[in-house]
Amino acid sequence: MTNYKLDMQKRDKVGSNAVRKLRVKELIPGVIYGKDFEPINVTVDEKELRKVHLMAGTSSLIDVKVDGEEHTVIIKDVQKHPFKNHYVHVDFKEIKMGEVANFTIPVVLEGRDEIRLQPSVLMQLLDEVEIECLPKNLPNEAAVSVIDMQYGDTFEVKDLDVFKNPDIKVLNDETEAVCSLSEPKEEVIEEDVEEVSADVPTVSETEEEDAE
């Protein structure tokens, strides 16, 4: 398990005016909170935050320094601008290394591009699982190999690797569906049927025939 690193500074001023001034300096406001822990308002460099967020996601431990004070955290929530690709605010949850905690980790379907049975359609039905463990046992993901799946197969939470790990308690129902494999349905191509217009006389033609 790799701990990522991030430097922060304490933030004394709050409010929209203070936030605008931070944006000019490419700094993002955030907060560190936790159990029996006084929340700390912080600022973090946006480029460094983006880099760590891309690698750590919300399921990896991050060692942070706040004006030299060390904490271990995970990214709990990130707010981004609805139109622009920049961060607006970030929440960090402090993790106590000696205490069991709840985490959310992503589900990964290993070998999804190498499934032997082809053609086939793989449907991922669960993106994340909730687990409980000591921080030192925190995995980056919950994985299952799908290479040998057959038509009609459905993998459940109990098939994930973390479910078999004695150091981890999975909080999801063990029968919750994770993914399924099916045979692609044949597309019914409707041929364009050209309507052959019947040789039906028009009103004027009928009138002409009657006149004759």
UniProtKB/Swiss-Prot annotation:
Q: Is Endoplasmic reticulum among this UniProt entry's keywords?
A: no
Pfam families according to UniProt: Ribosomal_L25p, Ribosomal_TL5_C
Q: Which GO terms describe its biological process?
A: translation
Q: Which SUPFAM superfamilies does the entry link to?
A: Ribosomal protein L25-like
Recall the GO molecular function terms of this protein's record.
5S rRNA binding; structural constituent of ribosome
Q: Which family does it belong to?
A: Belongs to the bacterial ribosomal protein bL25 family. CTC subfamily.
Q: What does this protein do?
A: This is one of the proteins that binds to the 5S RNA in the ribosome where it forms part of the central protuberance.
**NCBIfam families, alphabetized:** bL25_bact_ctc (TIGR00731), PRK05943.1 (NF004612)
Q: What is this protein called?
A: Large ribosomal subunit protein bL25
Species this protein is from: Finegoldia magna (strain ATCC 29328 / DSM 20472 / WAL 2508)
